[in-house]
């Protein structure tokens, strides 16, 4: 079978939900009083949108092959990402065979090294990479998970991230991850409120349901240690992203400090095999959570996962819907997946990237069989307005 080449690369921007899931209307739990690195400033404490968490918007990358097949993917990156795709990265794709993903990733990464390495540049490369996998799988008429070696389990099981773990239990999830509400700047009273919230939820869900705390890079080692020790009484399974992502030394110390049996997790805002190598070799965590739309895409996540496996560390990708489902179902060291509750009150199961994607699967009773539709199995919603701010 002769493989087509890449004819066109296009980048679009979307506002209002989608891959930039913080871009929500007022009243959404994800923008409520949540501990952040900016919570040290009272004026930015009540809402994450107040300090601009949603300024980027969604980036949509579309790649068309010479036979007319179109692959696409979505990530966070907005207009900045669209500029990088159109003005820089497209040259490394157009004219290449759709199979040459490793070469294209290498050229995208090393050509942007002087202004990239992490952040929005890696988000953008990740979006392109995911679109390439979607395209290749569609050309081969099979789901992405088959390109990754095939499934190692019949179905995925999920924990839910959201403000209502008690409702998540009723919906069949195996655990619930709460956003930590009060930051170190709110002192001992804030710490007490954090523990009280955990205790309240433990009382609602019983002893066998997992409970975790997502700290979103907002703590220091001293506070995180106090939180972990106080939370141990209430069966906290893991403490997540407690420290800024570059504080590898702090994570290693925190992991030594937490009570026996409690896990330390991080990696949502880490990128590439080199970043995760630091986390793994320094013994920073028990579980890594790369976001496939931010860490370098599927191509890089395969390498990150292999490193983690060699260190006996679990890989549970952050959110990212179908892009992580197709990966997790193929890996023994990814025993479960995250589902981000995107209903404003976390009281129902809705697709993570709603309303941007159609045919996006959701767990039923906390479980899912990954569809065998070619590619990642989703379509863009034609009712969502795409803007193409740049062309090449």
UniProtKB/Swiss-Prot annotation:
Query: Keywords in UniProt for this one?
Result: Lyase, Magnesium, Metal-binding
Pfam families (UniProt xref): MR_MLE_C, MR_MLE_N
Question: What molecular functions are annotated in GO for this chain?
Answer: L-rhamnonate dehydratase activity; magnesium ion binding
Residues at which substrate binds: 22, 48, 338
> Which InterPro entries does this chain map to?
Enolase-like_C_sf, Enolase-like_N, Enolase_C-like, L-Rhamnon_dehydrat, Mandel_Rmase/mucon_lact_enz_CS, Mandelate_racemase_C, Mandelate_racemase_N_dom, RHMD-like
The catalysed reaction is: L-rhamnonate = 2-dehydro-3-deoxy-L-rhamnonate + H2O
In this chain, Mg(2+) is annotated as bound at: 214, 240, 268
Q: Where is this site: Transition state stabilizer?
A: 338
Cofactor names from the entry are: Mg(2+)
**GO BP, one annotated term:** amino acid catabolic process
Q: Which domain of life is it from?
A: Bacteria
Q: Does the keyword Ion transport apply?
A: no
Reported EC number(s) for this entry are 4.2.1.90
What quaternary arrangement does the UniProt entry report?
Homooctamer; tetramer of dimers.
UniProt family annotation: Belongs to the mandelate racemase/muconate lactonizing enzyme family. RhamD subfamily.
Give the free-text miscellaneous remark of the entry: Reaction proceeds via a syn dehydration.
**Which HAMAP family does the UniProt record give?**
Rhamnon_dehydrat
Protein's recorded name:
L-rhamnonate dehydratase
Source organism per entry reads Paraburkholderia phymatum (strain DSM 17167 / CIP 108236 / LMG 21445 / STM815)
Lineage, highest ranks first: Bacteria, Pseudomonadati, Pseudomonadota, Betaproteobacteria, Burkholderiales
